[in-house]
Amino acid sequence: MGISEVGQEMRFGTVCLWRGDRHAYATEVELADSLGYDMICGGDSQSVYREVYVSLAVAAMHTDQARLGPMVTNPITRHPAVTASSIATIDELSDGRAVLGIGTGDSAIRNLSERPATLAGLREYVVALHELLRGRPVDWHGKRIHTSWIQRPVPIYITAEGPKTLELAGEIADGVV
């Protein structure tokens, strides 16, 4: 997986999926970290994989260098306050190594018979997350939400293939997956 932050050279990561034995998963993330991968990611699809933020917490306790994050979460199955709190917790556990990958939704959405987020919905979600990850309150669908305990912002990457999503990522994201 190639990851590019705005103004930075491309780095490489791997996806480690907790599929069974937790000890095997811990060994897998330790190996990826020791091999020098820049990022270790987990899939966020409730019907296919273990809970991504629990997996990332395990990874945080078994790695020292690689950045950690979901690749990718989505605006349909995750409320922005829950996502902000979850990734900020991973950031705290990993001593500042968290990143947040977001897309419109794939298997997590299809398996619930839902539709992926629109680009407008993705924009709204990412903008809200940027604010929440800075400890600022946000008006979300008519309700005021906040995550006042968060200590530092976490970089947000957007999955992008087409020109419209790439343009959106260039406007509001810290990087592209």
Tell me the role of every PLM-derived stretch.
Residues 18, 46-47, 74-76, 104-108:
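Active-site-proximal loop/turn and secondary-structure-junction residues that shape catalytic pockets
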Residues 2-8, 82-175:
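Internal, glycine-rich beta/alpha segment that forms the wall or movable "lid"
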Residues 10-23, 73-80, 151-161:
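Active-site mouth loops of central-metabolism enzymes
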Residues 1-71:
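N-terminal beta1-alpha1-beta2 module of alpha/beta enzyme domains
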Residues 24-27, 51-54, 81-85, 168-171:
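Generic recognition of short, well-ordered alpha-helical segments
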Residues 67-76, 96-99, 129:
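Short, basic, helix/turn surface patches
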Residues 25, 37-38, 76-82, 108-112:
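Conserved N-terminal glycine/acidic-rich loop preference
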Residues 41, 67, 99-101, 177:
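Conserved beta-strand positions in the central sheet of alpha/beta enzyme cores
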